[in-house]
Amino acid sequence: MKERIEKCEDIAKRMRRDMVEMSKYCGGDAHWGGAMSCTDALAVLYGDIMNCTTEDLEYGARDRFILSKGHNAMALYTALVETGIESPDTLEQFQQDGSIYGELAIMNEAHGIECSGGSLGLGLPMGVGMALKAKREHWTGKIYVMTGDGEVDEGSVWEAAMAAAQFQ
């Protein structure tokens, strides 16, 4: 257990270091507070809990992560690098013209980005929809959603929560 904790702590440290490095490419213009605050959770999910290796990105056995609070995309990008889904040099593309690694995540399943971010309250409904599909198609993978405090008052979040409870 101690080794698993230390592994996740090391991942989180590298993710934070990488986010600071990424600031060189965007002139420091990033959503630092949110990105730094979710780093530990992402380090545990991607480093210890989720099944999301590069070999199984296309299959129903892999787990999926939806970052509903899209302004924290830089934390997601560093988690994808830590998992090996993306290479470290992709971080240099953060907020560059023509890059898929913008300030807000843009859906690109081939790169481990399951959902576009930025519109408040859309991540949980998308996650519930994915979970329903997974249940119907007998996927073994799990769906994880990270929401932000700014979106919990959105009606779509409450509708999704009620639907998730109803459909289990």
Q: What are these language model-derived features?
A:
Residues R14, G33, S37:
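N-terminal glycine-rich anion-binding loops that anchor highly charged ligand groups
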Residues A12-D29:
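N-terminal capping segment at the start of a domain
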Residues K7, C26, M36-F167:
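Cofactor-binding active-site loop characterized by glycine-rich and histidine/acidic residues
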Residues M1-M15:
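N-terminal hydrophobic or amphipathic helices/low-complexity stretches enriched
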